[in-house]
Amino acid sequence: MIKNPELAQDFRYLIKQNGGMLAKGRLLGLQFAALFTDGLYQEISAHAIAMAEKLREAFTAKGYTYLAPNRTNQIFVIVPDAHLAKISEQFEYSYDQRIDAAHSCVRFCTGWATKEENVDALIRCVEKL
């Protein structure tokens, strides 16, 4: 905290100019440099997409439809509201939109840290509905 307003005026600029404050772009660039080294990004995203595909297959087998077809780690699935009530007792999802009086579109998203046993638990829950 700088109490003298005359010193405070250019303080941020002086810190940045003398290397005491890194630019956000540089920090983001370092993250991307690490991700794109030795196929790390492809490796961790492949797991996320594989887990999403496993969910997608189970949802399709259950007869659920999708807001739009995709092959990413995000699934926008249309589910009967009665099923969502049961699913929400054990699992989290993002509400997207109401489709009709009895159905809603929700988003399930997988990531590099998604555990297959958690995906399997969700699949078992859906199969019982």
Residue map of PLM features:
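Active-site C-terminal subdomain of aminotransferase-like
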Residues: 1-74
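Conserved C-terminal alpha-helix-loop-beta "cap" of PLP-dependent enzymes
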Residues: 53-127
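Generic structural signal for hydrophobic core residues of well-folded globular domains
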Residues: 35-36, 126-129
